[in-house]
Amino acid sequence: DFLKPEPLSIYAPENTFVNAEALNSALIACLRNARHEMYGDTPQYISEGIFSDIAVEGTTDKTGVHMDLPAQILPNEDMDNTDRTKLGRYWTEGYKRIKYANTVISRIDLATWESDAQKNHILGKAYFHRANVYYRLVHQHGDVPLILQEITEPKLDFYSVTRESILRKIKKDLEFAAQWVEVDAPIGDINKAAVNHLLTKVNLSLAEFDDAIASASAVINDGIHGLMTQRFGAYKDDPNHDIIWDLHQEENKALPENRERIWLYVGNEQLTEDGASEKLSVMRQAV
């Protein structure tokens, strides 16, 4: 046994993911990578919109971005390029988030917990992050590889699983999460309403409409959320705009009076790590 390495002075999964704080840090990595979809120059959600009927390229200060769509999705193309397209990031960033979530899920029983409620809250958030990625992937690609545990050694034999099977698996996970994820969360983190909102979309994808009504109603009737019907925020006294304008102003997104906010992707000009100070470029790049 003396040849067996024991990481006493370095960080390793065995001596790091030992409590709620440590496992939640892995889920913070999921939150970080989730914001990559939206922020910065040519983020992938703009690529997705341009490759659909939602938008056309609006960039006028450089060439190359989304100019030859059929050519830019060929197998030998670079689909993670600010000057062309970042459509491929849905795959690479998605499976990174799945990896982080699976690390938490696989190690959930190895940590020390204060209560079952604390444990299941963290587990429920991990289920949410994994389900959120798979919901996007199956609607973009159809059948995709389904990875449900932490991978700790080289693996090459990945096979696709049917879209419906994946949707049914993530529905089951989200139903568990909806029972345990807490109602309140720090701005930018996952709360119960976010779980039920995603569960509603999964139910709709499965054409299980009564279940969709139930999960949507859980958000609408939680006493916290609801449709905004009155002007609010920084421009509420400006007669030239309306409530739709109010909802889409960055100054108003995180206001407590905004009852339509469920889960916020947080950016801050004072945070420079990992592009956290970057803003949305959709008004520049998508028309």
Report the location of each language-model feature.
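Structural transition elements
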Residues: 153-165, 208-211
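Glycine- and aromatic-rich loop/turn segments at beta-sheet edges
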Residues: 145-150, 179-188, 227-233
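Solvent-exposed loop/turn segments at secondary-structure junctions
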Residues: 144, 152-153, 268-270
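Conserved, well-structured interaction surfaces
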Residues: 19-43, 61-141, 157, 161-164, ...
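An aromatic- and glycine-enriched ligand-binding surface/loop that stacks and positions planar moieties
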Residues: 2-65, 175, 193-287
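Short, well-structured active-site flanking segments
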Residues: 138-149, 209-216
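Short linear capping/connector segments at secondary-structure termini
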Residues: 8-12, 79, 148-155
